Amino acid sequence: MWILALLEPGKGYKINLKLTALLCGFSLENTMLFDSHLHLDQLSDENIQKTLGDLKITGMLAVSTNLKSAKKLLNLKQTYPEKLYIAAGFHPEQSLLNLEEREELFQWIDEHHSSISAIGEVGLPYYSKRENLNLDYAPYIALLERFILIAKKWDLPLNLHIVHNDVDIALELLEKHNIQRAHFHWFKTDEKSFQKFLSTPYFASLTPDILWNPKTQYVAQHLSLNRLMIETDSPWPHEGFESAVISEQLSAVIKKVAELKSLPLHYVQEQMLLNTQQFYRL
């Protein structure tokens, strides 16, 4: 594999990527890391640059939490168009937007749909509901359905914050609108809902908590490898890792998946990268 590099002003040189990797002290296999869900804009400017400059990472899908977040990610993408892919959405674990804010977000998505790779992070506020049992879910469900519709309008996949009891609600909405591409990030649910999920074409991603969380390990063991992706949800902290060292987190997830499925490490790594690229059409 060859890439072009500018070693002197005005002169283009071809560099062998495998040779470059070896000279930098890591194998080509370790360059096949793709973070399918992170909050890049929430990192410090220094860590953003470190993450985007990490040669072990071939790409990343940065999700947004609101319109301001999406705009910042789009600006970053203009600097790193070959490595950074972005999603636009509204994280559900926060107060709902007012009408004006909501319309502004959807208008922005309509205007920039060709620059984004997904609608996300969107979903339902499971953890907020757990803290406030009186939380009205109806407007959140309505907002999720609208995100589903705009994803369908522009043929974009969904990057979803859907866990536990909310899985059935989401699956019903996705089926209602005949959605084929939905990515359930950091997926976990009960056995009954998991069986429903198995009958769909949807994907799930695994975080570093697979190292110790039996629920995440269960997903890795029982979902086909060709429907799995890896993620960090950075800067969310994971025990034993610094949030900025994303490549180390991703490598640890792949290694654990290979162990749980009793498969060769390189095969798992290649397949998960392929899964992500095909799902997001990169």
Task: Annotate each language-model stretch with its function.
Residues 13-282:
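Mid-domain alpha/beta scaffold segments of enzyme catalytic cores
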Residues 6-9:
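Short, low-complexity, intrinsically disordered N-terminal modules
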